[in-house]
Amino acid sequence: VGEELKPMSDEVYLSIIQENEPDFSQQICRDATLDELDPDALSVLKEKYAKKQNNPIFLTLSNRQILSDLQLITDEGVTNAAVILLGKEDFIKRVYPQASVMLEYRHSESQITFDNRISYSQPFFIMIDRLWHDIDLRNGKFQIKEGPYIFDVPYFNEEVIRESINNAITHRDYTRHSETVIKQYPQKLIVTNAGGFPHGVTIDNILTVPSTPRNRLLADVLSKTGIVERSGQGIDKIFYRTLSEGKEAPDYSGSDAFNVELILSAIIQDKAFALFIESVQQNLAEDNKLSVFEIVVLDKIRRNEKTTALDKAVIKQLMDLSLIHV
């Protein structure tokens, strides 16, 4: 009583809505039939599913059986996840044009108009390899050499780029009518997708808080086919690889309640740090390699940043490995 009522911000309102929003990918696409699914994409799905599950028998199953096993089709019809992952290009363009991915290339970061733009509306299992191929065409590499250590660091690490795109497609809000956009520059790449972070995730806790994917069925299928990590390890990989290469940390600071923006820099800020991580990892047993959290803390120390209370356990581990001295 007597308390002042304050207007609810857009961010708070969207957070409440997202907490209870239905799984778009699980919903039935009323216009879709099995004839609208791409046979080549289905073949890729079956191959990846059989490999991930270590069961070649899956290759002999009918398309209908595989789709049913993965819950991509039900008695009610074909799901939106099936359309996004497997739909024929012309059908995707007609029913869900927002599922397309736009790749724009600019030779300068100050440039407004793009030099080249390609739209990808193929089913995910066909599109993802084509998209990486086209990004890689303009890729380059740095050579790091010191003593016995000689290795090349690509401007854009394939695993990092694939994980970034997979995350955008898995977590985006398909009820918003805007495509996922990738802006590529000679030494920077920006991925923007519609919809804010999944409920409970913020820039500050992105590595530590488990989240429920916005498109749960889509994420489940990509997990079962070995495309994404269901436990959120995709973000871990993005940070792990980027920081290990001595580059600036992945930057999500441009994200808000309506879009997630990831900026990846190709520039190696600290070759010595990349060499240090490489040498440490080579000398550690396979089951004792540095974790993403240890590398994040080492990167903070390198940049003279304050460490948080949550970092204390990691600092102790690094001290036990004689990698730092406090």
State what each model feature region is.
Residues 1-278, 282-292, 296-324:
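Conserved N-terminal catalytic/coupling substructures associated with nucleotide/phosphate chemistry
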